[in-house]
Amino acid sequence: MARPGQRWLSKWLVAMVVLTLCRLATPLAKNLEPVSWSSLNPKFLSGKGLVIYPKIGDKLDIICPRAEAGRPYEYYKLYLVRPEQAAACSTVLDPNVLVTCNKPHQEIRFTIKFQEFSPNYMGLEFKKYHDYYITSTSNGSLEGLENREGGVCRTRTMKIVMKVGQDPNAVTPEQLTTSRPSKESDNTVKTATQAPGRGSQGDSDGKHETVNQEEKSGPGAGGGGSGDSDSFFNSKVALFAAVGAGCVIFLLIIIFLTVLLLKLRKRHRKHTQQRAAALSLSTLASPKGGSGTAGTEPSDIIIPLRTTENNYCPHYEKVSGDYGHPVYIVQEMPPQSPANIYYKV
């Protein structure tokens, strides 16, 4: 049987291997800058909203700030909508409510984790090279909290465009002139396509890249749909391949540790048997009678369980300790006729 120290070492090795595999399989995630959902937030640019480029594994916090002194509290209900809903500022059909900002004296924080597969049935799932939209059709007042048309989406362009897994520096100028604005693109795309010759000025203003990314996601592009499906398929294949490789490595390590423990156990058992065989009954036997024990029979030869320190046998002491009582091994002697026999006449 494996010793407790060996058992603890094997468990520690397995835990370290599992932790290492999890660290290798998990991409380098980061927490994006939180977004305060307020009409005073300057990040919501007119006609464009807020465009971010998260990667799989990143986290984004949307904060409903608490009421400030001297200003009325802004009531909002945030939705995850489709591109056409974001363009029309309408949440009438199939609304997906994310969070409701309706507690003036409390800061509400809603965290979005960009993951391709969610362990929760109601969790959000995102795909690479796809665009997702968050907006609100509330007007900021308590009476307009349940509005499904217009609201701050239309008046202040309060929307978040999330371009998952895309590169903000990837520029494709050809799409500005050949592609047609679709419902998935917002007002910035329409403005850019009206003046395609101002490409250099768009670069200097820092808006050119955002336009290209939004135009890239629209179905008007020639091979956009097939490219998205191919990239999604490739990402799924890569993910399953990584998971499969990790499982194979984990199984190989488990098999190696099992074989190692069996070898150690076999070696320990063989060593114990060799030491037990070396201790013969002749070397362990010691007569019970002695100088101070008169009247004892010579046949009562007692073999002590624990001999000298060099000939100590751990197996016999373990058995004796398990059963709780000392065990004596008595050598059998042939019966002898008594020396003194008296006959009554």
Curated annotation (Swiss-Prot):
Residues 30-164 form the Ephrin RBD domain. GO terms for cellular component: cell surface; cytoplasm; membrane raft; nucleus; plasma membrane. Residues 262-293 are annotated as: Interaction with ZHX2. A motif (Nuclear localization signal) lies at residues 259-272. Residues 258-345 are cytoplasmic. A motif (PDZ-binding) lies at residues 343-345. Residues 169-227 are annotated as: Disordered. Expressed on lateral floor plate cells, specifically on commissural axon segments that have passed through the floor plate. Expressed in cells of the retinal ganglion cell layer during retinal axon guidance to the optic disk. Expressed in myogenic progenitor cells. GO terms for biological process: axon guidance; embryonic pattern specification; ephrin receptor signaling pathway; neural crest cell migration; positive regulation of T cell proliferation; regulation of autophagosome assembly; T cell costimulation; T cell proliferation. GO terms for molecular function: ephrin receptor binding. Residues 1-24 form the signal peptide. The modification Phosphoserine is found at S280, S286. The chain crosses the membrane at residues 237-257. Keywords: Cell membrane, Developmental protein, Differentiation, Disulfide bond, Glycoprotein, Membrane, Neurogenesis, Nucleus, Phosphoprotein, Signal, Transmembrane, Transmembrane helix. Interacts (via PDZ-binding motif) with GRIP1 and GRIP2 (via PDZ domain 6). Interacts with TLE1. The intracellular domain peptide interacts with ZHX2; the interaction enhances ZHX2 transcriptional repression activity. Belongs to the ephrin family. This is Ephrin-B1.
